Amino acid sequence: MEMHMGEAPGSVKVTEWQQSYYGTDSGIHSGATTVRSDDDGTEYSSKKFTYTTTFTENPAEVESQLNMTRAQRVRAAMFPETVMEGSVIHSTQIDPSQQTNVQKLAEPSQQLKAAIVHLINYQDDAELATRAIPELTKLLNDEDQLVVNKAAMIVNQLTRKEASRRALMQSPQMVAAVVRAMQNTTDMETTRATASILHNLSHQREGLLAIFKSGGIPALVRMLSSPMDSVLFYAITTLHNLLLHQEGAKMAVRLADGLQRMVPLLKKSNPKFLAITTDCLQLLSYGNQESKLIILANGGPEGLVNIMRTYNYEKLLWTTSRVLKVLSVCPSNKPAIVDAGGMQALGKHLSGSSQRLMQNCLWTLRNLSDAATKQDGMENLLQVLVGLLSADDINMLTCATGVLSNLTCNNTRNKTQVTQSNGVEALIHTILRASSKQDVIEPAVCALRHLTSRHPEAETAQNAVRMHYGIPAIVKLLNQPYHWPVVKAVVGLIRNLALCPANQAPLRDADAIPKLVTLLSKAHQDAQKPGSSAQRSYQDGVRMEEIVEGCTGALHIMARDPMNRGTIASMDTIPLFVQLLYSPLDNVKRVAAGVLCELALDKQSAEIIDAEGASAPLMELLHSSNEGIATYAAAVLYRTAEDKNPDYKKRVSVELTHSLFKHDPEAWEMAHNTVMDPVLGDEELDGYGPAGYGGYADGMHMDPLDPEMQDDFRSGMPYNSMARVYHDY
């Protein structure tokens, strides 16, 4: 009795609702669609009658037959459903490939009729859904899981049609009921149906807003842990649509721990599913440092690199490369990507047919390369990069030269590999073709500077620059309008080229000496201008003291050549070199003492050095803790004292012996060798200056890219000498 008095079972309620609303099948119960597919064009134009074309030798009889059947033909063409089945209609169509005028006129009427029928059915769908919404909402909130399941199936069918879908998304109560049902049910079929409903609604902006307002995002994020693949697909696709088009969705997904659930999905094997997942990661991490760190903490770099290494589905590779590009500007993610083999995995896709994938990989490699200077196994990548130097695309050249510059910095193996791969010739041709493109020229010159020093093939590289007619082009880069970062790189390269005796004459013939002296004088004047040191230190990110040091160091090496020594001294440079001995920077003191050491080999220059009062600062420098400074100072003092009276020479000898050589008698002989070897400080590995130039400490020497540019690429990104972190792009 209590059972009869209580609430009816769920199945009974569904049956009662069906009977109260519909006397006939509405299409919901059976799943029949309201509008039949008319893909084959037969629904409204199928001919259940036969056209016959009769040929006779009597024209009058033919004309009579056609006149009698004219109305019948028009009616059959315009309203084919009015013709009785089995009727025979005479046709005037002679050529089956050409329509008659009546047939042509009938087409618009049939199209209009079809449109009217579709419109009627559309309106029927909308009205049906509108009437059903209140009751369906109630059923979705029912405690009986069977009722909820049946209601979810019905709503899922309704959301597959545009009219009913629009009606449903305009009901906040309905959408909220779907979200609650998805969260609360333990039935997988109900979960799949409700996830499908939200997926269908997410194709319109109104649906996205309804899902967002109803708290659908946290529910969808929880569905990312579902064991059912179809639920996973519906959830990730719906979230993807929300991230793309719904304002506030990104923050909501982050707050719901969406990233923590998405990153493990990278282990799935469906390429299309992975493409959507990686695009979600890109949308969430772009411009958000916290999201990048969450991806790192959940093993994202390893999963992303594995995708680049394993799959060949272009869209997946492209979306994955976009995520890596965003992560590659994060100082924490950068080494993780490199350690996971990211450089090699990205390098695999530099020779494919997809231009957008290649560009993404190049930008990412460019961002990562300063953290990969110690990586092994770069041979294939380096060869590909050298090959890309022949490209005409400015973005490819910018990236390829930048990566080569970083990977050859303080890495003997990479320097040798690039040199043996004809990298020097390719870089010179790149410089010649780049003209005024300074964002290409600077890294190309930096790469050449690295290749021409401190590795077994350095002398080969120095000779290759000359043999491929690179010296005149390189010296020209000292002129304006090239920016200071380019000038600084060129000065360092000239110094390295001068280490090869065969390059001394070509450098002199290219007017390298007067250009270096002019540049040195200008930089020294700029460095001495009144004002705070912070204000005068940098121009385009380059300290003028670094230019002073670089020019003096280059002149030091060029002064090894007797003819060059005379040219340098004749340009009234000795007073400036003596003045540089008072510099507060040890690097400047060292190169100044070094060039004076070479110039002092000529008697006339030695007399000028002494007359300029160099003895006092040189005596002071004998006590320097920098071995190079002390050694050069001793050599200059010894050479300038050779023509002095015996008492002076004795005093100098005693001072030198006491201050510099009391612990190493043999060093005295080394101090006055005819040619002093340049002393390389630790900071001069592949550059010069307090921080070294070539290492690209925390990023490459390039301006940040426009943060709004996610997929497009632009060229005008001038380098400067400051190591900096990239913004997202």
Curated annotation (Swiss-Prot):
GO CC, one annotated term: adherens junction
Molecular function terms, GO-annotated: alpha-catenin binding; cadherin binding; nuclear receptor binding; protein phosphatase binding; transcription coactivator activity
Highest taxon of source: Eukaryota
Subcellular location: Cell junction, Desmosome; Cell membrane; Cytoplasm; Cell junction
UniProt keyword annotations, A-Z: Cell adhesion, Cell junction, Cell membrane, Cytoplasm, Cytoskeleton, Membrane, Nucleus, Repeat
Major localization listed first in the record, in broad terms: other
Region listing for Disordered, in residue ranges: 23-43
Role of this protein: Common junctional plaque protein. Required for Kupffer's vesicle lumen fluid retention and expansion during embryogenesis via maintenance of cell-cell adhesion junction integrity. Plays an important role in cell-cell adhesion via maintenance of desmosome and adherens junctions in the heart and is thereby required for heart and vasculature development, potentially via regulation of the Wnt signaling pathway.
Family label: Belongs to the beta-catenin family.
Quaternary data: Interacts with ctnna1 and cdh2. Interacts with cdh1 during early stages of oogenesis, interaction is no longer present when oocyte develops into the unfertilized egg.
Protein name: Junction plakoglobin a
Species annotation: Danio rerio
Taxonomic lineage of the native organism: Eukaryota, Metazoa, Chordata, Craniata, Vertebrata
